[in-house]
Structure formats: C-alpha cells, structure tokens
C-alpha cells in the first residue's frame, strides 16, 4: 500500500529535498507540492493525501491556519508539522489546531521517512527528545491549571489515567510497556480506549489535554528515571 504525501513549504529547495527523500523510498509517493497555506488547503482537498508535511511559516496563509482548516474540513490526512527548533513559538498552536506531530527540519532522511510512516499508521509523532521539551515550554504559557477535572477525564480507569500521564512525558509504546510491565499490544489497547473516551483524534491531542487540565506539569514527573 502506497502512502501519498503532500509537501507544503515556501522554499523550493526544501520541497525538492523532501521530494527526493520520499521518492527514493518504496511505498511512498509525492501527491503534490504547495508553497503556501492556501495551496496546501486546495491540494489537500484535490489530491486526498495520506500525510501532509506542513511548514509553519509560509506566506498568504501560515501552516497553523492551514492545518486548522484542513482538519476542520474533515480531511483524513494526517498532518506532520515541520519546525526549525523548539524556539518556534507557533508549533504548540499548530498541534492544538489538529496536527498529529512535528519534526525538526534538520532531521535525517531516515527520520523523515520513519515520521511519515508513523503518522500514516494512525499514530502520533511523540519523540521524547522533541515532544516533551516543546510541550513543557508551551505548557508554562498556559493559564493556571484548571481547578476542576474535565468530565471526560473522570471516565478513565486508573490505568488509563496512568497511561495518559506517561504519554504526556513522551514515552513510546515500548517504553510504556516496560514501565507498566505489560505488552505493547496492551498499551495500544489502553491508548485507543482513552482516546475514544476523551473524543480525541490521537496521542498529541491527549498530551495537550493532560497539560491543559493540570494532570501533568512541566518538568520531571514522579517515577521518572533519575
């Protein structure tokens, strides 16, 4: 099965580089290229890609608003936001807009391919090296944590709540399984269950909710390795 990728970036050299990486990999193909947010929205509608690589800073319409409109349109495409580094203050907003993850632009070709495959599989890109730092940084800018727990969170079992806390720390399925002494299949089952109960699309949205609800706060968490 071929994964079709829409590349959205205002720099032609960047688009060309991504195209070369994608076309060199079996099972991946480029669905199209957009140089701004408006083109991204139009091509997402016209080409029906599986994955969209979305730059944040583009002319006419930025990647954040493009992401929001594509998600709101009901597109099945999974959106991977591209950023220069964690100083990019727009990444958090893009994730809130419905992106399924993000990747540094200087990632190695193999990392880009892996990210596309992860997103296409319906998962979210939550690498601890990037995700936790970014979410912690932007969580500090959030309003004071809520004094009451969102109703949906009360529907989670104790184990699902624990899984959500660990997800917010950027743990992978394998790391979650090791921490909880269960199989990866069991972890996936817990994640699917909590996403369904919370009415969320993917893990990224679950992590955002955990921070916004005060379930997790920036910095080391109880039980983290020293």
What are these regions (language model features)?
Residues 91-96, 101, 106-158, 162, ...:
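Short, flexible helix-to-coil linker/hinge segments that flank and couple to helix-turn-helix
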Residues 58:
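Receiver (REC) domain active-site loop signature in two-component systems and cognate sites
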Residues 33-51:
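Acidic, metal-coordinating helix/loop segments flanking the phosphotransfer/catalytic sites
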Residues 195-226:
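Basic, Lys/Arg-enriched C-terminal extension of HTH/homeodomain DNA-binding domains
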Residues 36-39, 61-65:
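Acidic catalytic/metal-coordinating carboxylates
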Residues 42, 64-76:
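Short amphipathic alpha-helix used as the core "switch/output" element in two-component signaling
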Residues 9, 55, 83:
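Active-site residues of response regulator receiver
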Residues 170-205:
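Recognition helix of helix-turn-helix DNA-binding domains
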């Amino acid at each position: 099965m071929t994964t079709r990728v829409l590349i959205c970036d205002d720099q032609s050299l960047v688009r060309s580089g991504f195209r070369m990486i994608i076309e060199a990999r079996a099972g991946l193909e480029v669905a199209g290229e957009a140089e701004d947010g408006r083109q991204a929205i139009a091509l997402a509608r016209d080409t029906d890609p599986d994955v969209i690589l979305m730059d944040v800073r583009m002319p006419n319409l930025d990647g954040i608003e493009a992401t929001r409109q594509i998600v709101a349109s009901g597109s099945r495409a999974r959106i991977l936001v591209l950023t220069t580094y964690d100083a990019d203050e727009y990444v958090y907003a893009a994730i809130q807009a419905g992106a399924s993850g993000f990747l540094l632009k200087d990632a190695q070709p193999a990392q880009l391919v892996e990210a596309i495959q992860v997103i296409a599989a319906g998962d979210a890109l939550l690498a601890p090296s990037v995700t936790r730092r970014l979410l912690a940084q932007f969580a500090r800018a959030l309003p004071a944590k809520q004094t009451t727990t969102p109703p949906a969170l009360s529907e989670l079992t104790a184990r699902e709540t624990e899984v959500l806390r660990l997800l917010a720390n950027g743990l992978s399925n394998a790391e979650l399984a090791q921490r909880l002494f269960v199989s990866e299949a069991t972890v996936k089952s817990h994640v699917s269950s909590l996403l369904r109960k919370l009415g969320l699309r993917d893990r990224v949205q679950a992590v955002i909710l955990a921070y916004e609800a005060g379930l997790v706060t920036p910095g080391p968490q109880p039980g983290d390795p020293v």
